[in-house]
């Protein structure tokens, strides 16, 4: 079929060339003397080239062409881009499954709480088997049939598309703004510049939050940053047909951003290492997709693989959670009985552990198909795919959509092995986590290569597969601690923190001032108390410096605060009073915080 299509297009191209050559011979006699033959030949070459481009095709939705970039006021190029994504969204409208899951769970479901990847949860791993996971979210045969058809139709439809030439170029960072998230995005940008990162930043302003003129036109350009909009890639009439919300904006930021190499960040996620060279580092260069882990094991419904048409070999174990290096015979008593083995350890499945998508690195040339399928999962996430992927697990949302899409296409990716860290504070009620700590993927990959070499030497060489036996002394925890996790900052296998995902509370001065959240026994308290973990970067102090300077001293207008406070001088005084008091407290306690006191 593909050969026939190509022959047809070649025939059309040859035919049009013959016609144009004929026109050239005829019109050459009558051409204006001011038009040279060279100029006419150049025009002919351009026309033939444009026709060739128009009818060039690929069965791979992720194919990319090498042509002139289409952004930066290239009106014709932008129209091509809008046409491409208009087709994508038309397919989304036609192919999305109808209705929604009732989110009813079978009484036999054993998922009564989140299952982590620490030793105290190992006793619960049988609950993650295909047999047990299939007893949770209830999906009827008709629903499965409908989901299967819609998934197949969408995949087939986007496979017919060829992205416009130069759709994405360069490298940079994107996040989602709008409302309070624009203010938080600005805090991220200031952190990036504090760290010496010079990569450009794009902030997606959702359709309902447009109008941040001062922020977009005056503040951001000073920091090599700018606002982008859904209307950059979609016609207005298409936008009006969709209701976007929540996690779906991240998928939109991914495709709307102009960068080929993209770091997609949540607006409350602060990079605390220089990032300018991250796109030149392994494993990003070879895979084009790097993700980070969550705290929890994967709980994807087995029926997802049926819906997506993914073959799962239930007789072949290929890993033990994050350990995909040690031979399965070492940690599996009976390779012929995998009935209690976690589903995600089987060949063909999405690997453990679950994904935390507060940061994502993606090459959109290599992984355009991943981006487009994850868009489908996110558009249909609240109705179907979020519960199918997570089944009541914490953080249900877009987090599994990117890795699932890459896994579907068999595209390469790397998920960081180092466990997610936690930062927070203690009070009379116990420990309160305020941030997730995600680690340096380059260092992590170096530890992974060390693990491959060490384990390869132990089990490789002259040993046959039959000679490798079950080892009762094997431990996933030992594997993890030996090669990746070590709280000793000076240990050879220590991996630096790269991102502080400050998920609760967020650095929103209005909410913080209203709740008086960061107090203990009526006194101000620090929420980040282990600064050595983060190379002594005092994130609270630095962010409140920015808030004080831009909100209270310079009075830069942020639409979120302007809409909330308006002309109410009393409210402005209260909010800025909180900011200045908090800043004074953080400055006075900085040295003690660095010392760990």
From Swiss-Prot:
UniProt subcellular location: Golgi apparatus membrane
Glycosylated residues, per the record, are: 34, 363, 473
> What does the entry list under GO cellular component?
Golgi apparatus; Golgi membrane
**Enzyme's top EC category:** transferase
Which phenotype arises from disrupting this gene? Leads to calcium resistance and vanadate sensitivity.
Query: Quaternary state and partners of this protein?
Result: Interacts with SVP26.
**Function summary:** Alpha-1,2-mannosyltransferase, responsible for addition of the first alpha-1,2-linked mannose to form the branches on the mannan backbone of oligosaccharides.
Protein name per its UniProtKB record: Alpha-1,2-mannosyltransferase MNN2
This protein's encoding gene: MNN2
